[in-house]
């Protein structure tokens, strides 16, 4: 727990080489006056390698003989890893654009494909007997270590997505705006369950009020628009290579035979779910935006509500069992988003001042079944349960500190531990006259009530200087170290 170990002895013990190449090409064909066909290809390739050296670390400890303790196994070691990842996307889009009278229309149809592949291989060895590996980057290769101590690991996956989409934008008189979209996505992540495909929709509308005749005489108002939208989105991402088909792990062993012996074994890394499917988000928002004083002042406000259904999440294992993955429930997030910005130009000088604020109220609507909870955290302090914020802190409410033995005698009996003056005084939440595990309750929420930001900028000709500040408030932090047990 000595932070100076990391600062003094572990600094500069890793060497990395990272390379990345990305690019895109496209071809466009305009035909029949109102049609356009566009094909786009993009690729992103990354290659990352690292070598990490483990030194022998000794620290002072007055509680042991000689006052010196060697951390770890007392041996130097080297770890090497190599990772490559490729991402390839292709888009095929056909667009129709036309205007007649006071109407304008843009319609798009097409398809997209996305492919992602990752491979990683790593290995580690410690020093040979009596042969310390030098703290020299030129020597940080696993071939210098003892082959008998070799360990290795690997990680790999392939994933692809195919989508078909359509979108329509309609404008009447330059003031009434409508849009609608549809897409059908298929993901290889759910190919094992047969739930690869899912449909998603969205609609939206806007009214540019400032273009109406009854607002033309308001000289200080440059633009005023009311807007609203509703739509559905999908999520297939989980921290698993193949969410519907678990990989095998060799982190387990078993005892067989007479006489018994320990044999290495393989086990599913998590329980498969034959019904696993897309996570879906249904969202709507309504708001307004406006420009004032020759477009120098911009103000925008939106109320939003998002409901996540068929939530993709992992259920922790219990009593040595492996975890499970499933579509566990639904979550609601709602709040407001506000933004204001002032921008002006004075000769060669320009400046801008802006601020934004977002509020959020989070609640779990349902979770597997009534009364079910997901427990996580170093000390099982994070709970997720229907009717509460996601990941809320669960524990005992503190009413104060015991001052005297007399106060302890008059207080509800603490059955958790023997208390003395100076100990924390817990609240008897259920009122049964005792402090028990049944008195645990919600004591905090890790999700901030509000996030905010401030932007300052100044420019002179081709020179710019900007400052961005951000923060959050209304959330609690659970300190898992140096706390009451």
Which residues are covered by each model-predicted region?
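Extracellular/periplasmic, surface-exposed regions of secreted and cell-surface proteins
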Residues: 1-54, 65-388, 471
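Exposed, low-structure sequence patches enriched in small/polar residues
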Residues: 40, 110, 167-169, 226, ...
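Extracytoplasmic gating/loop element in the C-terminal half of outer-membrane beta-barrel translocons
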Residues: 60-62, 187, 415-421, 472-485
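C-terminal beta-signal and adjacent terminal beta-strands/loops
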Residues: 219, 361-363, 391, 403, ...
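Conserved active-site-proximal loop/helix segments of enzymes involved in bacterial cell-wall
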Residues: 312-317, 365, 435, 479, ...
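Glycine-centered loop/turn motifs
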Residues: 379-391, 414-424
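Acidic carboxylate motifs that coordinate Ca2+ or other divalent cations, activating on Asp/Glu
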Residues: 432
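Conserved SET/PR-domain catalytic core that frames the SAM/AdoMet-binding pocket
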Residues: 438, 448-462
């Amino acid at each position: 727990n000595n932070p100076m170990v990391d600062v003094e002895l572990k600094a500069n013990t890793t060497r990395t080489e990272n390379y990345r190449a990305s690019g895109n090409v496209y071809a466009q064909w305009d035909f029949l006056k109102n049609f356009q066909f566009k094909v786009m290809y993009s690729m992103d390739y990354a290659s990352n390698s690292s070598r990490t050296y483990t030194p022998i670390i000794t620290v002072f400890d007055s509680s042991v003989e000689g006052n010196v303790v060697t951390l770890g196994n007392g041996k130097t070691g080297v770890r090497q890893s190599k990772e490559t990842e490729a991402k390839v996307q292709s888009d095929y889009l056909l667009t129709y654009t036309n205007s007649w009278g006071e109407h304008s229309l843009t319609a798009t149809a097409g398809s997209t494909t996305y492919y992602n592949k990752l491979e990683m291989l790593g290995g580690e060895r410690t020093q040979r007997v009596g042969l310390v590996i030098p703290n020299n980057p030129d020597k940080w290769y696993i071939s210098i270590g003892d082959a008998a101590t070799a360990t290795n690991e690997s990680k790999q996956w392939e994933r692809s997505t195919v989508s078909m989409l359509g979108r329509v934008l309609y404008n009447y008189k330059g003031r009434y705006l409508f849009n609608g979209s549809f897409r059908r996505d298929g993901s290889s992540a759910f190919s094992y369950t047969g739930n690869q495909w899912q449909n998603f929709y969205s609609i939206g509308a806007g009214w540019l009020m400032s273009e109406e005749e009854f607002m033309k005489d308001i000289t200080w108002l440059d633009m005023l628009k009311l807007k609203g939208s509703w739509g559905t989105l999908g999520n297939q991402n989980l921290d698993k290579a193949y969410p519907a088909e678990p990989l095998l792990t060799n982190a387990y062993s078993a005892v067989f035979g007479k006489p018994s012996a320990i044999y290495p074994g393989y086990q599913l890394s998590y329980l498969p779910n034959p019904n696993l499917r897309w996570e879906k988000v249904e969202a709507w928002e309504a708001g307004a935006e406006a420009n004032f004083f020759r477009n120098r002042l911009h103000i925008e406000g939106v109320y939003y509500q998002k409901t996540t259904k068929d939530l993709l999440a992992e259920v922790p294992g219990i009593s040595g069992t492996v975890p499970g993955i499933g579509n566990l429930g639904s979550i609601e997030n709602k709040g407001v988003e506000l933004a204001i910005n002032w921008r002006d130009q004075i000769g060669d000088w320009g400046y801008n001042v802006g601020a934004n604020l977002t509020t959020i109220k989070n609640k779990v609507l349902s979770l597997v079944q009534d009364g079910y909870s997901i427990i996580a955290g170093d000390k099982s302090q994070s709970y997720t349960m229907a009717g509460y914020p996601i990941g809320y802190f669960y524990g005992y409410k503190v009413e104060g500190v015991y001052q005297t033995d007399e106060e302890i005698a008059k207080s509800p009996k603490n059955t958790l531990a023997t208390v003395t003056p100076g100990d924390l005084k817990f609240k008897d939440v259920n009122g049964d006259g005792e402090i028990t595990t049944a008195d645990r309750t919600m004591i905090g929420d890790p999700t901030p009530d509000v996030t905010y930001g401030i932007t300052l900028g100044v420019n002179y000709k081709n020179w710019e200087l900007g400052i961005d500040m951000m923060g959050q408030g209304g959330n609690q932090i659970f300190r898992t170290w140096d706390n009451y047990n």
